[in-house]
């Protein structure tokens, strides 16, 4: 399966693009914008069908969107003057993976643990507990191992949580306050270098993403060649 990586750079004159990619945006709205780049009429789970993973990147020139998919997004489906898209295939990078190769990696993920029912009741914990600091780093090391990577260096930085509200399809606007489900995905950005231990596991992790919250900008694993350590 061919994978594509697209960088979406919002047009400076598009207030809509700046709003949708900016801080405090509705992550559900951003998800809908991303999915609008792909054909309609597919079965449920359209994100999985098109292999979509995405992440907002803060750059000196403003916020950009990185988008991975199994078919190129269609820029004609965006509003006029919304953004510029640049797409390239990831196959050459993925095909060249081999054990021992050193890579740069980046992933904004949602590190959590799910305590058992007894532990939750005893300590009055929620069903999902966000991880921070050393606990988040340890979570990443486990995820990297399962993804065919041996972590060499790691920098972790908390980023704003992905927050939104979800409503049943038949809920009226007047009843939304009573029937909404709160969505909250704690997020940490992990950067560093790693050595490839299992290319097949790594390809699967790139294809499938890491962790939860993938519809809300979590889980995209980006890799790039790095010089081998001396």
Question: At which residue positions do the language-model features occur?
Answer:
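RNA-interacting cores
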Residues: 1-230
């Amino acid at each position: 399966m061919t994978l594509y990586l697209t960088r979406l750079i919002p047009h400076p004159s598009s207030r809509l693009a700046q709003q949708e990619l900016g801080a405090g945006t509705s992550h559900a709205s951003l998800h809908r914008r991303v999915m609008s780049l792909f054909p309609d009429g597919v079965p449920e789970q359209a994100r999985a069908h098109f292999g979509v993973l995405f992440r907002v990147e803060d750059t000196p020139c403003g916020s950009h969107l990185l988008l991975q998919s199994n078919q190129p997004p269609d820029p004609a489906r965006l509003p006029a003057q919304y953004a510029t898209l640049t797409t390239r295939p990831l196959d050459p990078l993925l095909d060249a993976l081999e054990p021992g190769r050193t890579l740069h990696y980046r992933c904004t993920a949602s590190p959590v643990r799910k305590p058992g029912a007894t532990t939750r009741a005893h300590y009055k914990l929620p069903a999902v507990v966000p991880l921070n600091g050393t606990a988040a780093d340890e979570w990443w090391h486990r995820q990297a191992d399962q993804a065919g990577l041996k972590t060499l260096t790691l920098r972790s930085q908390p980023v704003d949580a992905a927050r939104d509200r979800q409503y049943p399809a038949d809920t009226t606007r007047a009843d939304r306050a009573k029937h909404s489900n709160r969505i909250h995905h704690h997020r940490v950005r992990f950067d560093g270098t790693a050595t490839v231990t299992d290319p097949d596991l790594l390809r699967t992790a790139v294809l499938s993403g890491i962790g939860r919250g993938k519809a809300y900008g979590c889980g995209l694993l980006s890799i790039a060649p790095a010089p081998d350590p001396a």
